Amino acid sequence: MNGFSTEEDSRDGPPAQAAPFFGQTCCLIDGGERCPRPAGNASFSKRVQKSISQKKLKLDIDKSVRHLYICDFHKNYIQSVRNKRKRKTSDDGGDSPEHETDVPEVDLFQLQVNTLRRYKRYYKLQTRPGLNKAQLAETVSRHFRNIPVNEKETLAYFIYMVKSNRSRLDQKSESSKQLDA
């Protein structure tokens, strides 16, 4: 679905492509040198090749290799470049000067689906039912980037909580224990 084949997709191929883990290295040439990393289960499909050529990345396939598997590093690199370009062009036309500030990029795709759903529920984000993890992460990250934050107040509160060895979770569990007694 995202341009990378899974292990299940490759089971129908020839035996040389069926098992990417037996000593095979990444099939890509990065900046003129062959990538030495071990191959993962993501394959270098035509869609990925088209994406790389559109982004003008210095990646090419090694023609002497008999498989199309790429390492996890290059898989994540290609996905991140694709996602960054989408974000830059989709947010307010991409040329507004207010987006030029140095905002750290948070990868919410690393969170579990349940965590993303809890975030969506807490902030009452409107989405269509049945979103997959990637769509949910994109919706949440769009909202997350637009939340106004008073940095000074937030940092002061965080430092206070760290110094006092307390958190809201501790307070909730203590209050529930008091109710039980």
UniProtKB/Swiss-Prot annotation:
Disulfide bonds join 26-27, 35-71. It comes from the Eukaryota. The zinc-finger domain mediates direct interaction with DNA and phosphoinositol phosphates (phosphoinositol 3-phosphate, phosphoinositol 4-phosphate and phosphoinositol 5-phosphate). In vitro oxydation causes reversible disulfide bond formation between Cys residues in the zinc-finger domain and reversible loss of zinc ion binding. Interacts with components of the histone deacetylase complex sin3a, hdac1 and hdac2. Binds histones and nucleosomes. It comes from Xenopus laevis (African clawed frog). InterPro entries: His_deAcase_SAP30/SAP30L, SAP30_C_sf, SAP30_Sin3-bd, SAP30_zn-finger. Keywords: Disulfide bond, DNA-binding, Lipid-binding, Metal-binding, Nucleus, Repressor, Transcription, Transcription regulation, Zinc, Zinc-finger. One of its GO terms (molecular function) is non-sequence-specific DNA binding, bending. This is Histone deacetylase complex subunit SAP30L-B. One of its GO terms (cellular component) is nucleolus. Functions as a transcription repressor, probably via its interaction with histone deacetylase complexes. Involved in the functional recruitment of the class 1 Sin3-histone deacetylase complex (HDAC) to the nucleolus. Binds DNA, apparently without sequence-specificity, and bends bound double-stranded DNA. Binds phosphoinositol phosphates (phosphoinositol 3-phosphate, phosphoinositol 4-phosphate and phosphoinositol 5-phosphate) via the same basic sequence motif that mediates DNA binding and nuclear import. A motif (Nuclear localization signal (NLS)) lies at residues 83-88. The lineage of its organism: Eukaryota, Metazoa, Chordata, Craniata, Vertebrata. Residues 82-103 are annotated as: Disordered.
